[in-house]
Amino acid sequence: MGMKMGGVNMLNTLMNTGYQLLLETVFYIMAIAVLAGAISGLFSEFGVISMVNKLLSPLMKPLYNLPGAAALGVITTYLSDNPAILGLAEDKNFRKYFKKFQLPALTNLGTSFGMGLIVSTFMIGLKLKGGHAGTAVLVGNFSAIIGSIISVRIMLHFTKKEYGTEEYCVQFEEHEDMDAIMNTREIRDGGIGGRAIEALLEGGKNGVDVGLAIIPGVITICTLVMMLTNGASADGTYTGAAYEEIAFLPWLGKKLEFILSPLFGFTDASGISVPITALGAAGAAIGLVPHMAEAGTVLANDVAVFTAMCMCWSGYLSTHVAMMSSLKVNKLTGKAILSHTIGGLCAGVAANWIFKLVMLFL
């Protein structure tokens, strides 16, 4: 890396990229975590989490082997970003539904739907040759669900070996009735207004703690991923500016094109750069698509795959480390990344073939 960029330029790029990530990514994630934490605190105080758990347990248990309350994490991350689920995980009224082996899988579950609304809205707005962008996005969302189930199930296979399947995250006294605890919740003293404000502030404070906890992981890991993903400046030279990198991952993708293209059905070899970029940042990945669509190298089938993989992966290499650290399960980070890599690949393959099947009837 230093030989290609020059030692001084490489160090300057490292520092500038880390600084830009702090300003543009970390504080953004912290803001999301604060808002999500505040909302989850409000939901917890007024029984929304308990209600969601009761309503969706019949669905979440067979699909994910998670309590129904986990569905609230899906909704939260779909509307915002991966770390939003951490604000929920800090709430005792949310954690009490989870056994110890289930909690680490929240990282995989939340990441599978991170930035879902943003990615979907962005892709629907594309002007594609042949149309069908809306159908492609629907297929992509459905395929992301498939990928999330695979990712979570693989992760639970590892966590069961680590924690067993009996112990709950929230410790209860021997004399306490488990059924009574699961069907009741703690509330604050005072009127509705006072309880709401207190819940919002306490939940937001949990979000600040989450935002601070993810700083080391985001800056170090995401900087490394960016160094391997992006290319040189516009004129092909290295100046030491942020995000000037050696573009190793796109180069690797082209070398593996003979394997990846049949699986994902890309219209053009350049399409592989989108899911590869999504490893580090979904926002950066979808930013590549409009130019490809204008050039005619991206069609509806590609959009289905991009939607599924950008949603399912949504920059997991840059957030998984921080999220697992925040949940205090660092030792399982490698297994979480492996599980999610497989889940994202399955989401992309599913999107390709499901879209082809759907188009037979349209």
Spans of features found by a protein language model:
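N-terminal signal-anchor module of multipass membrane proteins
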Residues: M1-F46, M51
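Transmembrane helical segments that form the transport core of multi-pass membrane transport proteins
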Residues: G7, A36, S40-L56, D189-A282
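Membrane-interface helix termini and inter-helical loops of multi-pass transporters
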Residues: V8-Q20, L128-K129, A234-D235, M359-L362
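Short helix-coil transition sites and intra-membrane helix breaks within transmembrane domains
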Residues: Y28-M30, G41-M51, Y64-P67, G73-G87, ...
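Alpha-helical membrane-inserting segments
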Residues: I39, F43, G147-M155, T159, ...
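Membrane-embedded helical hairpins/re-entrant loop segments and their flanking transmembrane helices
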Residues: I39-L72, A89-K100, L256-L260
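C-terminal transmembrane helix pair
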Residues: A84-R153, A282-L362
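Intrinsically disordered, low-complexity non-transmembrane regions of multi-pass membrane transporters
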Residues: F158-K205
